[in-house]
A protein has these predicted regions:
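Active-site glycine-rich loops that stabilize anionic/oxyanionic intermediates
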Residues: 24-25, 32-37, 99, 244
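The serine-hydrolase catalytic nucleophile loop
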Residues: 34-46, 70
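Conserved alpha/beta-hydrolase
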Residues: 48-67
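Conserved acidic catalytic loop of the alpha/beta-hydrolase fold
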Residues: 76-94
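Conserved hydrolase catalytic core segment
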Residues: 92-136
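Alpha/beta-hydrolase
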Residues: 140-229
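Short beta-strand/loop motif that positions the catalytic acidic residue
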Residues: 234, 240-242, 246
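Catalytic active-site module of serine/aspartate enzymes centered on a nucleophile-bearing elbow/loop
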Residues: 263-292
Length: 292
């Protein structure tokens, strides 16, 4: 792993990123979830190192150490990544997105097809504004979407109120209690009993909240907006992985996404949930991605 580095954007803005895996390997841009940050890519480090994969994991604008970009759109992301790629001396690349990182990987694939070889979408977020029936979403997501539409200022206040608590690091002895409070699928709870996996998931979330509530909110707003392109515009190979026990985004929603992608190889994994899929299957995911 390499220490955090920064790429200069327009004006005084910067984007922070870290690298994992093999520094001389096949380049893969990692798109973290929400709320999360670049250190979520710790999940990839050992398998990426063994497989000869170079993981470049940036914080999105406003997250952790990257500068806030108010009112940003999903369409702004490819330009940020171009700066990161040029800074790192990378031409063609692949992308790996987990959960809320999915729209960002799709955006790169749709607008940078000359550089994107393939993308892997793992328990990925779907185009939420296109949903006619939101029952396949986690209830918390349904509630936030409804509040964003009806009382956005209240939602912003709630984010600011939650930040001091969600930025805290809970004592190790309280982790079992935290896992019970989250009401996770058994497969997810079991996977998160691994200390390294727990840290990769939850420390990356805490880093996001420590940055600012405004940054987390700006990232959340992306999901409540049109993407600016359709899934049918993504012509690069897509490797879609989704657990049949996923509570955040039902695998039925993922099946509909797979049908719309022109070049998609989808795998729906039994007894895998939103957390256990990337924790248990990262080696297979990376092997499949670099072979595309």
């Amino acid at each position: 792993m390499k220490k955090e580095r920064f790429v200069q954007l327009q004006g005084d803005a910067v984007v922070a990123f870290e690298e994992y895996g093999d520094a001389n390997g096949v380049p893969v841009i990692f798109c973290h979830g929400w709320p999360s940050s670049r250190t979520m890519a710790r999940l990839t480090h050992e398998p990426a190192r063994d497989l000869g994969v170079r993981i470049i994991s940036p914080d999105r604008p406003g997250i952790s150490r990257s500068s806030l970009h108010p009112n940003r759109k999903l369409a702004d992301w490819p330009r940020v990544i171009e700066r990161v790629l040029d800074h790192a001396g990378i031409g063609e690349f692949r992308a790996l997105a987990i959960s809320g990182g999915a729209p960002y990987a799709y955006a790169m694939a749709a607008t940078m097809p000359e550089r994107v070889r393939a993308i892997a979408i793992v328990c990925g977020a779907i185009p939420m504004v296109e949903l006619e029936d939101a029952r396949g979403l986690l209830p918390l997501y349904r509630w936030m979407l409804a509040l964003h539409r009806s009382r956005p200022q209240l939602l912003r206040k709630l984010f600011c109120m939650a930040r001091p608590i969600l930025a805290l690091r809970p004592p190790v002895r309280l982790r079992p209690l935290l896992l019970r409070m989250l009401m996770l699928r058994p497969c997810d709870a079991e996977s998160l009993r691994d200390a390294a996996a727990f840290e990769a998931i939850f420390e990356s979330q805490r880093r996001a909240w420590r940055g600012s509530a405004e940054g987390v909110m700006a990232d959340a707003q992306i999901y409540a907006q049109p993407w600016g392109f359709s899934l049918e515009d993504v012509h690069v190979p897509v490797r879609l992985w989704h657990g049949k026990q996923d509570r955040a985004f039902s695998f039925r929603l993922a099946e509909e996404v797979a049908k719309r992608l022109p070049d998609c190889n989808a795998r729906f994994i039994d007894n895998a949930g939103h957390y256990s899929l990337p924790i248990r299957h990262m080696r297979e995911i990376l092997e499949d991605l670099v072979s595309a």
